[in-house]
């Protein structure tokens, strides 16, 4: 990570399932992100829009890493066709629709699916063959010269040094030496995108996504 920022949370993406909906509709269990393009899932899946949610970037990273940009366009076009009106602006919306039984399959944050399953909801998840890609949220202090709040660095230091224990209750992935991720939240196929996740790369992937709608 750059020296000017400190990560405070990390999230991974995965395929989320409503087990009751899967059984009722006699749907095949997907094993990959590419599977979500199959015609049998038309009207049965929900994903997020990368123009409004970084959760969708986890899906794009997986597809592009495995298949390259051109094949990803073909796959994503079919995924969006299957999702129809269930392409969501919020990263948590697909999980909410899976919970409610509006769709059988969604793409979302892994730790949320793990928590729902542990709570006894009819929720399961599949770590896709393409990998569980991750994003971090980081904290930094902006130097605004004379307008810099002198307490800003103290607040940032307090969050980094004292907030991680509580943050890990919702974002359980370990980030720092000495932290541990419990076994339920250890993903089956962690991957890292080969390029730095810059604003320019995000805009490039947003453009690719728009071409698939």
Question: PLM ranges: what are they?
Answer:
Residues 19, 49, 110-111, 171:
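Short secondary-structure boundary segments
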Residues 16-21, 136-148, 167-170:
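A bilobed periplasmic-binding-protein/Venus flytrap-type ligand-binding module shared by bacterial periplasmic
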Residues 179-213:
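Extracellular/periplasmic bilobal clamshell ligand-binding domains
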Residues 99, 104-122:
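A ligand-binding cleft/hinge motif common to bilobed small-molecule-binding domains
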Residues 40-51, 75-80, 87-88, 119-143, 158-180:
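Periplasmic-binding protein-like
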Residues 1-95, 99:
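Extracytoplasmic ligand-binding site segments that recognize negatively charged/polar headgroups
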Residues 71, 75, 137, 147-159, ...:
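Short amphipathic alpha-helical coupling segments at ligand-binding clamshell hinges
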């Amino acid at each position: 990570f750059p020296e000017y920022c400190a990560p405070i949370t990390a999230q991974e993406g995965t395929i989320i399932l409503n087990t009751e909906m899967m059984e009722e509709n006699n749907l095949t269990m997907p094993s990959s992100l590419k599977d979500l393009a199959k015609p049998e899932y038309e009207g049965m899946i929900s994903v997020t829009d990368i123009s409004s949610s970084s959760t969708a970037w986890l899906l794009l990273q997986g597809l592009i890493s495995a298949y390259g940009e051109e094949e990803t366009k073909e796959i994503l076009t079919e995924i969006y066709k299957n999702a129809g009106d269930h392409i969501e602006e919020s990263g948590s919306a697909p999980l909410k629709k899976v919970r409610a039984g509006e769709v059988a399959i969604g793409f979302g944050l892994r730790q949320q699916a793990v928590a729902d399953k542990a709570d006894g909801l009819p929720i399961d998840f599949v770590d896709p063959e393409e990998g569980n890609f991750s994003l971090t949220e980081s904290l930094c202090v902006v130097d605004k010269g004379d307008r810099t709040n002198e307490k800003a660095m103290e607040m940032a230091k307090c969050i980094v040094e004292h907030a991680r224990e509580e943050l890990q209750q919702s974002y359980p992935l370990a980030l720092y030496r000495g932290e541990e991720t419990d076994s339920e939240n250890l993903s089956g196929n962690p991957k890292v995108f080969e390029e730095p996740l810059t604003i320019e790369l995000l805009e490039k992937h947003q453009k690719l996504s728009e071409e698939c709608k």
